[in-house]
């Protein structure tokens, strides 16, 4: 039986601009370094014992035509100057034998920090609930983060986000963020 549990993963992001919507997505994938691969979108689990490696190291381990399992976020606009973002949030448990969470989030009108924090918040909330850590969705991010720190169960949260404004001439603008799992 195939062991398809990822041992490593890396984060990447990109943006693309073109008159054609699909081509702008292709350019975003090129900017992210993974255009020459076949992406398979999967659900949002950070595998137990998986190691987060650098983008550079991850890109060195892939080859053209390879099937890549990814959790990704993509957002597109052809409205001039419209702010758009795509983000993937990560929440890792302290116990490396447990799985963590990855979350996808797209937004219009948010800064890179706002979108990234929200994606991170989603992943952390999913992890907290799976670990039985109580949380109040109405608390602000800093209060929730403090609650999770006190529990001692959540090791690390982070995100990768690509944010830009729509092309001034109305060309399609795509933003893309991904966690790429390497099996």
UniProtKB/Swiss-Prot annotation:
It catalyses: L-arginine + H(+) = agmatine + CO2. GO terms for molecular function: arginine decarboxylase activity. One of its GO terms (biological process) is arginine catabolic process. The modification Pyruvic acid (Ser) is found at residue 44. InterPro entries: Pyr-dep_his/arg-deCO2ase, Pyr-dep_his/arg-deCO2ase_sand, Pyruvoyl-dep_arg_deCO2ase. Belongs to the PdaD family. NCBIfam families: pyruvoyl-dependent arginine decarboxylase (TIGR00286). This is Pyruvoyl-dependent arginine decarboxylase. The gene is pdaD.
């Amino acid at each position: 039986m195939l062991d398809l549990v990822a041992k490593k993963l890396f984060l990447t992001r990109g943006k693309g601009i073109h008159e054609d919507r699909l081509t702008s997505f292709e350019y975003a994938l090129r900017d992210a370094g993974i255009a020459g691969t076949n992406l398979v979108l999967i659900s949002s689990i950070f595998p137990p014992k998986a190691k987060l490696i650098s983008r550079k190291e991850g890109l060195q381990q892939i080859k053209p035509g390879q099937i890549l399992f990814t959790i990704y976020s993509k957002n597109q606009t052809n409205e001039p100057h419209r702010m758009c973002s795509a983000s993937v949030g990560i929440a890792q448990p302290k116990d490396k034998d447990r799985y963590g969470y990855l979350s996808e989030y797209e937004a219009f009108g948010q800064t890179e920090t706002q979108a990234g924090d929200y994606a991170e918040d989603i992943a952390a909330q999913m992890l907290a609930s799976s670990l039985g850590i109580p949380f109040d969705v109405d608390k602000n991010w800093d209060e929730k983060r403090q609650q999770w720190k006190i529990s001692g169960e959540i090791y690390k949260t982070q995100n990768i986000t690509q944010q830009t404004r729509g092309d001034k001439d109305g060309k399609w603008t795509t933003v893309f963020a991904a966690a790429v799992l390497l099996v």
